Amino acid sequence: MTQLSVVILAAGKGTRMYSDLPKVLHTVAGKPMVQHVIDTAKQIDAKQIHLIYGHGGELLQQRLSSEPVNWVLQAEQLGTGHAMQQAAPFFADDENILMLYGDAPLITKETLERLIAAKPANGIALLTVELENPNGYGRIIRENGSVVAIVEQKDANAEQLKICEVNTGVMVASGASFKKWLANLNNNNAQGEYYITDVIAMANQDGYKVQAVQASEFMEVEGANNRLQLAALERFYQKTQAEKLLLAGVRLIDPARFDIRGSLTHGKDVEIDVNVIIEGEVKLGNRVRICAGCVLKNCEIGDDVEIKPYSVIEDAVVGKAAQIGPFSRLRPGANLAEETHVGNFVEIKNAQIGKGSKVNHLTYVGDAEVGSNCNIGAGVITCNYDGANKFKTIIGNNVFVGSDSQLVAPVTIADGATIGAGATVTKDVAENELVISRVPQRHIQGWQRPTKKK
């Protein structure tokens, strides 16, 4: 099987984005456009990925530092052909070279596999698409059904402008062919640039076959040159993802008001209300219900969990039949056992909450272990930070912590203990002890409230 290398063009400035950020780093579904393209290139088993960079190259390399790409500088942006010329020295004669664009993030593995499979043994395969309004795109010129040239909009005559089949810019040919054609490119055109599309005419002159493969969906090959186009890509992507989830059995109350910016795996009878955002890798069990306005990121949710409105869960695990929210925040390291309750305005960070325990109101639990069947009252704080270091709070089983208590870590509260409301606990508490640390109540007779001065 012939090996494949991929060239991704990513040197453009993106002037119409009106941004200091390189165009290809603008995001779709929370991920840079160029990252989508790199990920797709990996899926088709590219031997090597050549990334053509220019504007904002330092930032681009920083953001993609973990990616196994060959960085190829295009110091001057003189057209798509010029960009490919920079990568040509790295091409092996006997490999296939696939050309992609860093600002066209939604092209699929399946489409690229069709294109590669269609490449003639001696020739080039080109991805095209039919448009109702082809304005702005290079037109596909055919003779007797075969592609003989691509004419850019600014160079097209009146008859050619009527053609609706357009070039997507995606093509595949052998390394040897590309090197030969790229060496013969010129910039004799209205833009004064080196067009990669000129290789189509060269292939015909050499007697090579040019095979066109049509993309099934225009948005799959659409690029983003401005924020309006970027928003259109985002909406198309989200619509596609929502449709996949609906067909897989997930109930989305309103598919148009659901965003996924990562991956979602799910069980049966999952229900997701409006304005929910999924980020990173999220796993949902059976019969999970997520109410309006929640954000879930890199978390695992067990069966029969209900997440009430406007809760945020990040890098956390929630056990079966738990109830979360409304307005709860589970931060990284939160691990809730089954049948736990976490209520409104509760924040849990790097803490384990045991089976059946309840933390229902206005509470912070950080760097802690809470046993089973505990009740943590409203306004309780685990004081885990002394300004320099963090310390752990350990709470046993069947512990009752009264409202407005402060647990100053490091501290351990043993099984069955009761902490009276308003206590400040600084020492360990033994099993079944009652701790009260409040100031004795005083009654002042005849006291009068201050009055305002006239």
Curated annotation (Swiss-Prot):
Outline the segment boundaries, as ranges, of region: Linker. 228-248
Q: What are the protein's UniProt keywords?
A: Acyltransferase, Cell shape, Cell wall biogenesis/degradation, Cytoplasm, Magnesium, Metal-binding, Multifunctional enzyme, Nucleotidyltransferase, Peptidoglycan synthesis, Repeat, Transferase
Against Pfam families, the record matches this protein to:
Hexapep (PF00132), NTP_transf_3 (PF12804)
To which pathway does this protein belong? Nucleotide-sugar biosynthesis; UDP-N-acetyl-alpha-D-glucosamine biosynthesis; N-acetyl-alpha-D-glucosamine 1-phosphate from alpha-D-glucosamine 6-phosphate (route II): step 2/2; Nucleotide-sugar biosynthesis; UDP-N-acetyl-alpha-D-glucosamine biosynthesis; UDP-N-acetyl-alpha-D-glucosamine from N-acetyl-alpha-D-glucosamine 1-phosphate: step 1/1; Bacterial outer membrane biogenesis; LPS lipid A biosynthesis
InterPro entries (UniProt xref): Bifunctional_GlmU, GlmU-like, GlmU_C_LbH, Hexapep, Hexapep_transf_CS, MobA-like_NTP_Trfase, Nucleotide-diphossugar_trans, Trimer_LpxA-like_sf
The entry's free-text remark on the cofactor is: Binds 1 Mg(2+) ion per subunit.
Reactions accelerated catalytically: alpha-D-glucosamine 1-phosphate + acetyl-CoA = N-acetyl-alpha-D-glucosamine 1-phosphate + CoA + H(+); N-acetyl-alpha-D-glucosamine 1-phosphate + UTP + H(+) = UDP-N-acetyl-alpha-D-glucosamine + diphosphate
BP GO terms, sorted: cell morphogenesis; cell wall organization; lipid A biosynthetic process; peptidoglycan biosynthetic process; regulation of cell shape; UDP-N-acetylglucosamine biosynthetic process
Region annotated N-acetyltransferase sits at 249-454
Stretches the record annotates as Pyrophosphorylase:
1-227
What positions does the entry give for Mg(2+) binding?
Answer: D103, N225
* Ligand binding (acetyl-CoA): A378, N384, Y385, S403, A421, R438
Q: What is its EC number?
A: 2.7.7.23, 2.3.1.157
> Per its record, what are the GO molecular function terms?
glucosamine-1-phosphate N-acetyltransferase activity; magnesium ion binding; UDP-N-acetylglucosamine diphosphorylase activity
Q: Which cofactor does it need?
A: Mg(2+)
Keyword field contains Endoplasmic reticulum: no
Which residues bind UDP-N-acetyl-alpha-D-glucosamine per the record? 9-12, 23, 74, 79-80, 101-103, 138, 152, 167, 225, 331, 349, 364, 375
Oligomeric and partner information:
Homotrimer.
Q: What does this protein do?
A: Catalyzes the last two sequential reactions in the de novo biosynthetic pathway for UDP-N-acetylglucosamine (UDP-GlcNAc). The C-terminal domain catalyzes the transfer of acetyl group from acetyl coenzyme A to glucosamine-1-phosphate (GlcN-1-P) to produce N-acetylglucosamine-1-phosphate (GlcNAc-1-P), which is converted into UDP-GlcNAc by the transfer of uridine 5-monophosphate (from uridine 5-triphosphate), a reaction catalyzed by the N-terminal domain.
Could you say which protein family the record assigns here? Answer: In the N-terminal section; belongs to the N-acetylglucosamine-1-phosphate uridyltransferase family.
Protein's recorded name: Bifunctional protein GlmU
Gene that encodes the chain: glmU
